[in-house]
From Swiss-Prot:
GO terms for molecular function: ATP binding; GMP synthase activity. The lineage of its organism: Bacteria, Bacillati, Bacillota, Clostridia, Thermoanaerobacterales. CDD domains: GATase1_GMP_Synthase (cd01742), GMP_synthase_C (cd01997). Residues 195-384 form the GMPS ATP-PPase domain. It catalyses: XMP + L-glutamine + ATP + H2O = GMP + L-glutamate + AMP + diphosphate + 2 H(+). PANTHER family: GMP SYNTHASE [GLUTAMINE-HYDROLYZING], GMP SYNTHASE-RELATED. InterPro entries: Class_I_gatase-like, GATASE, GMP_synth_C, GMP_synth_GATase, GMP_synthase, GMPS_ATP_PPase_dom, NAD/GMP_synthase, Rossmann-like_a/b/a_fold. The gene is guaA. PROSITE patterns: GATASE_TYPE_1 (PS51273), GMPS_ATP_PPASE (PS51553). This is GMP synthase [glutamine-hydrolyzing]. It comes from Carboxydothermus hydrogenoformans (strain ATCC BAA-161 / DSM 6008 / Z-2901). The keyword Cytoplasm does not apply. The active site is at residues 81, 168, 170. Catalyzes the synthesis of GMP from XMP.
Length: 509
């Protein structure tokens, strides 16, 4: 029985969001490139198909298209934005360039309030973002919604199970968008909302057992969300046949190494090899000021230490990696958005003779967090902000010394502590302190000081590709600043970074 939806990706900026929204409605969903052969789509046995939006015009040279036979499968199809224009164009309708682009929140006048629009009002708000529009619907199609400037904002052909909308139901700016998707999934496709993290974990554990058998497995554990959840999931499947290697390179946040040991060794009773490599990493970084060089040294040294430790474990065939679905999508579709970590120290070399276990490769980040909670990981790990592989090395500008690391660790700890206490930590994508290579004059007591400046950075983001700075309350910033200057020796000034990405990156180095 069909139990999933296929999203065909035409390169729209919201394509991944469509998949995430469908999964939030507890229906499993996969993304495939728009040019996936029809036989492959049929083999997948989907209960529904969604055509995503995209930047192209159906009349453009090399415009993405689909095999027209897809419309004869009698599988329910929902075309969104470009997906609607393509459906109209291929089935004999007329698509024209709009005189002006319709962009932003727009009143939607619903002409037929059953099936796709069941339970909605006659007028709803929708999010439009298009340059072309459907001027004439194909034969057999009923126009079901319009806007002031778009006479055909939605259309359907019930006999052929074809539905289309010109707006974006997947974005939050279409308030009833989730209801529309729900109607498509549950009422039109007849799918059951039974895809949960509990069912995913059970299936993943079975598959890991089948893949690994009695073989030994190793995992490079960073203490971040992805590697932590992957490690616990694999451990549930194979127990003591998994060994995790945790390398403390001396560039971690305050209490981080201790928390990893406490969580994985004590709480989960896992085989954990703890490598204290602080001295050798800091020795290699002595005198190095260039950020790219720092990154390369840390990456190279990490691989060397990991290989040494893995070799001590004897004959190991499998390596666990915390690859996520956006990485898979990015490598699989030329039109998809690029989502890649620029700081992945755990990027082990391709010539290592391991077979990969990637138990999270079908999940988005929010699903990984949900799975972590399902598996019993503490919230402090599950909700941890992204942390660069090179650690504090890219937050200490200029040369790295023990003194600078100690100052930054304490300042960062205070910043995060206050964000957690005030309820702001979970509202931010990433927050951290930076130690710029900058000293300034100050007065403390009656003494003149010449000490370091701490810069604070807090941003909101969906995926790290773009970010906006968080408008933290002045009272909170004042409290954080007073604590850092009062409690961290060697600091006499605190500044707050109010730059978005772009033009700045999230990290300073």
């Amino acid at each position: 029985m069909a139990s999933k939806v296929i999203v065909l990706d035409f390169g729209g900026q919201y394509s991944q969001l469509i998949a995430r929204r469908i999964r939030e409605l507890k229906v499993y969903c996969e993304m495939l490139p728009y040019n996936t052969p029809l036989e492959k789509i049929v083999q997948e046995n989907p209960g529904g198909i969604v055509f995503s939006g995209g930047p192209s015009s159906v009349y453009g040279e090399g415009a993405p298209t689909v095999d027209p036979e897809i419309y004869r499968l009698n599988i329910p199809i929902l075309g969104i934005c470009y997906g609607m224009q393509l459906m109209a164009h291929q089935l004999g309708g007329i698509v024209r360039p709009a005189e002006g682009r319709e962009y932003g929140k727009t009143p939607l006048f619903i002409l037929n309030r059953d099936r796709l629009f069941a339970g909605l009002n006659e007028t709803e708000i929708c999010w439009m973002s298009h340059g072309d529009f459907v001027a004439k619907a194909p034969e057999g199609f009923l126009v079901t919604a319009k806007t002031e400037y778009t006479p055909i904002a939605a259309m359907e052909n019930r006999e052929r199970n074809l539905y289309a909308v010109q707006f974006h139901p997947e974005v939050v700016h279409t308030p009833k968008g989730k209801e529309i998707l729900k109607n498509f999934l549950y009422e039109i496709c007849g799918l059951t909302p039974d895809w949960t993290m509990e069912s995913f974990a059970q299936k993943a554990i079975r598959e890991i057992k089948e893949q690994v058998g009695e073989e030994k497995v190793v995992c490079a554990l960073s203490g971040g969300v992805d590697s932590s959840v992957a490690a616990v999931l694999v451990h549930k499947a194979i127990g003591d046949n998994l060994t995790c290697i945790f390398v403390d390179h001396g560039l971690l946040r305050k209490g981080e190494a201790e928390e990893v040991v406490r969580t994985f060794k004590e709480q989960f009773q896992m085989n954990l090899v703890f490598v204290d490599a602080k001295e050798q990493f800091l020795a290699k970084l002595k005198g190095v000021r260039d950020p790219e060089q720092k990154r390369k040294i840390i990456g190279h040294e990490f691989i060397r230490v990991f290989e040494e430790e893995a070799a001590k474990l004897g004959d190991i065939r499998f390596l666990v990696q915390g690859t996520l679905y956006p990485d898979v999508v990015e490598s699989g579709t030329a039109t998809a958005a690029t989502i890649k970590s620029h700081h992945n120290v755990g990027g082990l070399p391709e010539d290592m003779k391991f077979q990969l276990i990637e138990p999270l490769k079908w999940l988005f980040k929010d699903e990984v967090r949900e799975l972590g909670l399902e598996l019993g990981l503490p919230e402090s790990i599950v909700w941890r902000h992204p942390f660069p592989g090179p650690g504090l090395a890219v937050r200490v500008l200029g040369e790295i010394t023990e003194e600078k690391l100690a100052i930054l660790r304490e300042a960062d700890y205070i910043f995060i502590d206050e964000l957690k206490k005030s309820g702001w930590y979970r509202k931010t994508w990433q927050a951290f302190a930076v130690l710029p290579n900058l000293q300034s004059v100050g007065v403390m007591g009656d003494e003149r000081t010449y000490a370091y400046t701490i810069a604070l950075r807090a941003v909101t983001s969906e995926d790290g590709m773009t970010a906006d700075w968080v408008r933290l309350p002045y009272e909170l910033l004042e409290k954080i600043s007073a604590r850092i200057v009062g409690e961290v020796k060697g600091v006499n000034r605190v500044v707050y970074d109010i730059t978005s990405k772009p033009p700045a990156t999230i990290e300073w180095e």
